[in-house]
């Protein structure tokens, strides 16, 4: 298959690995006991690394840290409770992406709410939810708008359409978050040693490569934006290792077939019309992060489900035995969590990192 097979070529992979090995041999200060730490921010990268066994092919002096780039994984329990509270209303059809169905809050999960009689539906696009609203004028249709900048354009365009069509029974619960402030928070705390970053491809497709430059300049860490195939990942690692060996600190773009310097400007325009930054947002396991989330602008406040239904914020503490937050910032591996593969597994997911198809714990368990 074009654009897939050529990025899974075993001979090219072997060549990249040999080049990596040669560079690392010239860096004797990095050892298996004191490795070079690279954070792959995106959960999609985590799954590629484990699915294709890249972690076992790389030099032992390179170790991965799994970052907070999975929106379902950082979804606070209190936000799920708000969704369940709305979904239980008899006049509501609640629409969500499938990954969010099994994330647990204090009140349970959306899947359990559906089993108890709530009209909860899985959709693949916010436009699907808008169509449901148009076809059910006697119902209030609520879409759970969840995700990083990757999903924000489709949500913004859907709300623009709802406004244009004067759809009065369509609302959103806004849980869209942004990646750059999160990485700022992670780096400013200095809790985890990170030598370089594999930056997310899909988010960068929207925001471009430029926003990473401030992080690079402020914290003196190299970034390489990369795609999701095995050769994408290997080439990006080679680019990072080369920068570190040459004592350079730059933002490089391995994913040039998709990502451009300024990103998708039409998508950015739609986002800026519909959304604005919030003062702060809560992240599961990470706490409050300044300017890391968005809310609807004044022109689109009429679509805010939490305003319409007068929802109160839910503050729910994470389980003290769960180490989701530590996994998200690289302080521990999934297997170090006492719940991993015991109380928390894919069939009975306790933590969000096990629920999501992009979660680090799900990747560890599966592969």
List each language-model region with its residue ranges:
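Alpha-helix initiation and N-capping motif
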Residues: 13, 17, 51, 80, ...
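Hydrophobic alpha-helical scaffolding
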Residues: 6, 73, 144, 148, ...
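A conserved active-site cap/scaffold subdomain adjacent to cofactor or substrate pockets
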Residues: 173, 191-260
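Phosphate/pyrophosphate-binding betaalpha-module
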Residues: 144, 148-211
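Internal helical hairpin/lid segments
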Residues: 235-326
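Metallocofactor- and cofactor-centric catalytic cores in central/energy metabolism, strongly enriched
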Residues: 1-138, 152, 156, 162-165, ...
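Structural motif
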Residues: 93, 140-142, 196
